Regions:
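A membrane-cytosol interface segment of integral membrane proteins
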Residues: 124-161
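Lipid-exposed faces of alpha-helical membrane segments in multi-pass integral membrane proteins
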Residues: 32-39, 56-64
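Hydrophobic alpha-helical transmembrane segments
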Residues: 45-60
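Generic beta-strand structural signal
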Residues: 91-93, 117-118, 127
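Phosphoinositide-dependent membrane-docking surfaces
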Residues: 97, 106-121
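N-terminal membrane-targeting/pre-transmembrane regions
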Residues: 1-38
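Short beta-strand segments
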Residues: 1-3, 106-108, 133
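Conserved beta-hairpin
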Residues: 66-107
């Protein structure tokens, strides 16, 4: 199966956000900051601390949220040439994944991928926990082709590791 695609900025930013929010360290950081903000609010209400402490925790939470939700995905999008290229991607049960651009091509065997994840707009093909490749779901010509690709990925990615 072969698909041709480029990237839509809005969808890529959403896919990158999904990746960041799925990271355990980001989730833990958000939980800790929320707990500290709630504790600071309670202590401020009970007059145990000054309200400025609650404002500081609120500002930290807001800044972290903006960083992970807006700034980090946008900076990666702007730095990466990948999102400006046009691709041809071939999925083959025997060969693996062949990616072609005007600058060259790369073939990955299925066992080069550690896992895959599906989000609203993309299939995320992970090489390891931090590096991945996004395959837009709208690049498939119809729902049946997308289901076939999903089945191929489920059967071949993460096996034999």
């Amino acid at each position: 199966m072969t698909v041709h695609f480029g990237y839509n900025k809005k969808e890529v930013l959403d896919g990158l956000r999904s990746h960041f929010f799925s990271r355990p360290e980001i989730r833990i950081l958000f939980i800790l900051i929320n707990v500290f903000a709630i504790v600071a609010a309670l202590l401020a209400i009970l007059k145990k601390i000054q309200p400025v402490s609650f404002l500081v925790f609120s500002f930290l939470w807001f800044f972290l949220y903006l960083t992970v939700r807006r700034f980090l995905p946008l900076s990666i999008y702007k730095r990466s040439q990948t999102f400006k290229d046009e691709f041809t991607l071939s999925l083959d049960e025997e060969q693996g994944v062949l990616l072609q651009t005007e600058r060259g091509q790369k073939l990955w065997k299925w066992n080069d991928f550690s896992m895959f994840k599906e989000t609203l707009y993309f299939f995320h093909l992970y090489f390891d926990s931090r590096s991945f490749f996004l395959v837009p779901k709208d690049s498939f010509k119809d729902l049946e082709e997308m289901k076939a690709a999903r089945k191929l990925m489920k059967e071949n990615i993460g096996k034999n590791k």
